[in-house]
Amino acid sequence: MAKGKENRIVITLECTEAKKEGKTVSRYTTTKNKKNTTERLILKKYNPNMQRHTLHKEIK
């Protein structure tokens, strides 16, 4: 059996700018290593509803 698989968790990233404007939010799923990155992720990703790159924050 492989060791260390329990450190990687699946997270959801949600658009913050669309939420403020009241538009449809875009969501992305990705994985992160909770041992190396303990704080919440903030990434710039493409929002197809707004047709531009926006900030996406990790949600629970």
From Swiss-Prot:
Q: Which Gene3D superfamilies match?
A: Ribosomal protein L33
A biological process from GO: translation
Question: Which UniProt keyword terms apply here?
Answer: Ribonucleoprotein, Ribosomal protein
Signal peptide positions (record) = none
One GO cellular component term noted in the UniProt record for this chain: ribonucleoprotein complex
Q: Name one Pfam family in it.
A: Ribosomal_L33
Question: InterPro entries given for it?
Answer: Ribosomal_bL33, Ribosomal_bL33_sf, Ribosomal_zn-bd
The SS bond pairs are none
Q: Which GO terms describe its molecular function?
A: structural constituent of ribosome
Q: The organism sits in which domain of life? A: Bacteria
Similarity-based family: Belongs to the bacterial ribosomal protein bL33 family.
State the name under which the record lists this protein.
Large ribosomal subunit protein bL33
Lineage from the top down? Answer: Bacteria, Pseudomonadati, Chlorobiota, Chlorobiia, Chlorobiales
Tell me the name of the encoding gene: rpmG
